[in-house]
Design a protein with these regions (language model features):
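A short, well-ordered alpha-helix in the C-terminal region of glycosyltransferases
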Residues: 360, 367-382, 388-394
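Aromatic "clamp/platform" in nucleotide-sugar-dependent glycosyltransferases that forms part
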Residues: 309
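Conserved donor-binding/catalytic core segment of Leloir-type glycosyltransferases
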Residues: 33, 209-231, 237, 251-252
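Short hydrophobic beta-strand element within catalytic cores of glycosyltransferases
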Residues: 326-329
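Conserved acidic donor-binding segment of nucleotide-sugar-dependent glycosyltransferases
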Residues: 341-352, 360-365
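Short alpha-helical segment that forms part of, or immediately flanks, the ligand-binding pocket
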Residues: 295, 318-322, 336-337, 343
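Nucleotide-activated donor-binding/catalytic signature segment of Leloir-type glycosyltransferases, i.e.
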Residues: 255, 259, 264-296
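A conserved catalytic-core segment of Leloir-type glycosyltransferases
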Residues: 1-31, 49-114, 186-192
Length: 401
């Protein structure tokens, strides 16, 4: 059954829904286009899937354009992504040519000239603005952790960024002094009515996970994340092994590949090999009912881990908290905004600290319950799609005028 916008009243409350309906009025009938590089496999695609749908539900003519490219193009953009997060990379002239020519080709059929506003998501699509006569405001929405970007790469990207009207990031630590245009903060969100986040019973969750091969003979801890070096799945396994020596448990790693991440397959293979060397570690990938499986796993886990070493936001943190499960997360990027240390989980800086917090939480059921209750209310107040939608409405009202 298709979701109606008023359905959000029962989970987010009347106040914010009424505020959205009030503030969207100047934007009704306006054409707004989002552009990114993938429809599946990452947080950006997941957010856009809900956000674009809801924008249309409340009267904005919102479209979603996808950049198409070769494997070579996505190899280059993965390097750019990693460089933005601080990796020591360098782009050759031929790589830059692939990057810029692919975007130029896409500009021929992306058809944005009649939009009232364009929102370009992440570095993959950044040069697109250079191929249009700018008749409307353009916003660059950067979803990744740019706390300490590779200096040479950042100098290259700034040439494109400064052509935009505004740059939107997910955390105040990502604001850059060397960017001339306006910068603002919009934190991401989860959609509480999707299959991934809707209410399901524990018995339903057990059936779903059972079909995926998960057994319940030992307490479950989990990490749900793309197979990516920045998510540190190998470090999670090591932390789990340390914890398991003191309190018996099992680890489930559930992930997928984003269509714009050619390195995911290699990290998946490394993770599977590392899991084989351990005990009671299950690795699940690209499942048919992935969203429901994530939902079930986050509900039935005693603890969810998000041990990222760089993180733009980390939607899986709020997803797990929404289900009343405490989270142990890396003390980086947007995770810091979601985990209130000691209240709904713990922020950790290394493998040993992660392991000790796993042990501590597994041994204290009452604390896990208290953290879960606090976490759900914290997400309701701060990280639901309704707040996110209102932030975008205010952004668009400001830039369109």
């Amino acid at each position: 059954m298709m979701i109606d916008f008023n359905d959000y009243r029962r989970v987010a409350g009347d106040e914010i829904v009424d505020q959205i309906i009030k503030e969207v009025k100047p934007l009704q009938g306006k054409d707004v286009h989002h552009v990114n590089s993938t429809y599946y496999g990452g947080g950006v695609a997941e957010i856009l899937d809900s956000l674009v749908f809801l924008m249309n539900k409340i009267g904005i003519n919102a479209g979603w354009r996808l950049i198409k490219g070769s494997d070579e193009f996505f190899h280059v953009t993965k390097l750019i992504h990693d460089g933005c997060q601080g990796a020591d990379i360098s782009l050759t002239p031929s790589m830059i040519q692939v990057y810029e020519e692919t975007i130029a080709r896409n500009a021929n059929f992306t058809h944005l000239k009649n939009s009232d506003a364009v929102i370009a998501h992440d570095p993959q699509v950044l040069p697109l603005i250079t191929h249009y006569k700018k008749n409307q405001p353009w916003v660059w929405r950067c979803h990744i952790d740019i706390t300490r970007p590779n200096p040479a790469l950042w100098d290259f990207l700034k040439n494109f960024i400064n052509k935009y009207d505004e740059m939107v990031v997910s955390d105040k630590s990502f604001i850059k002094e060397d960017i001339k245009i306006r910068q603002s903060i919009i934190m991401p969100s989860i959609d509480p009515l999707t299959d991934k986040n809707k209410e399901i019973s524990l018995s339903e969750a057990e059936i779903i996970l059972g079909k995926a091969g998960v057994k319940f003979n030992k307490p479950v801890i989990s990490q749900i994340a793309r197979f990516d070096v920045w998510k540190d799945p190998l470090g999670v396994i090591t932390a789990y092994e340390i914890a398991k020596k003191e309190t018996d448990c099992q680890l489930v790693l559930l992930g997928n590949y984003a269509t714009d991440d050619p390195g995911g397959d290699e990290m998946y293979r490394k993770t599977v090999q590392r899991a084989k060397e351990s005990e009671d570690v299950t690795v699940l990938v690209n499942l048919e009912n992935n969203d429901l499986t994530v939902n079930a796993l986050q509900r039935l886990s005693k603890i969810v881990i998000q041990k990222s070493t760089r993180e733009g936001f980390g939607l899986t943190v709020s997803e797990a908290l929404w289900k009343g499960t405490p989270v142990i997360g890396g003390k980086v990027g947007g995770i810091i905004n979601q985990i209130i240390d000691g209240k709904n989980g713990y922020l950790v800086e290394d493998i040993n600290e992660c392991a000790q917090k796993i042990i501590y939480l597994l041994k204290d059921e009452e604390l896990r319950k208290q953290m879960g209750e606090f976490g759900k209310q914290y997400v309701k107040k701060n990280f639901l799609i309704t707040r996110h939608l209102l932030d975008y409405i205010r952004l668009l009202n400001r830039v369109i005028g």
